[in-house]
């Protein structure tokens, strides 16, 4: 397995290293059931509720706040894929049952984290939901986009119903926690249109979040730092706070494995 060391070369816990160097807030990804029919995990850390609770227990020892990131999926949920959890598949065409699933899972999970002493400061309802969530997504084969989900009155109402179900659970279980809605995009027009749909459907949230990968696809111009200020100002104009939900950076430009790097010496 992976081992972590402090700056003195002593093997120790990753969370201790982070805490000792000023990190006071961590984001825990939550998947519903990241296993196949044989019980084998899909990979990616197998971040189900049980795995998240183990992280939360240790984080509590270091007085770290938690951001719980609900994907409402068994694996990665992002702009390309927002697949319904296996256990909810039978309810795909029943909007009311799906809302109940979201509410119940969110509430039950938050309670479990509270029982292990987690300090929940923020809850993210959905992950990178730019194009939709829970299988309400554009038909890319027909050239559809986010406008066919969030810009479609019927779809937007259903999607916002799911968001409100999750948010209701958060408000009931941990009323002091901030509710975050997270898009991958930093496109001003796109973000504004989606926020319009939330507003028109009465979605109650505190923080607008985006991802920020400056060299995504090797192109820094699409994700320049100036864009962050524009999106922050957009959030403020709607009475919301703004936060970067995802980012990363490299520690070396060198090639380590002979496969192409997203960012390399050529950049």
Q: Predicted segments — roles?
A:
Residues 1-6, 38-41, 45-47, 55, ...:
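Short, charged, low-hydrophobicity "junction" segments
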Residues 1-3, 58, 62, 96-100, ...:
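Proteins with a high burden of low-complexity, intrinsically disordered sequence enriched in S/T/G/P/A and R
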Residues 2-20, 52, 102-112, 188-200:
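Short, acidic/polar
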Residues 6, 41-42, 80-83, 137-140, ...:
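Short, glycine/charged-enriched secondary-structure capping and boundary segments
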Residues 6-9, 33, 64, 215:
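Intrinsically disordered, low-complexity regions enriched in small/polar residues
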Residues 7-12, 85-89, 142-144, 198-200, ...:
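Short, low-complexity, polar/charged sequence segments that are solvent-exposed and flexible
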Residues 12-15, 160-161, 168, 172-182, ...:
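Glycoside hydrolase catalytic-domain groove-lining segments
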Residues 17-178, 184:
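Substrate-binding cleft and catalytic face of glycoside hydrolase catalytic domains
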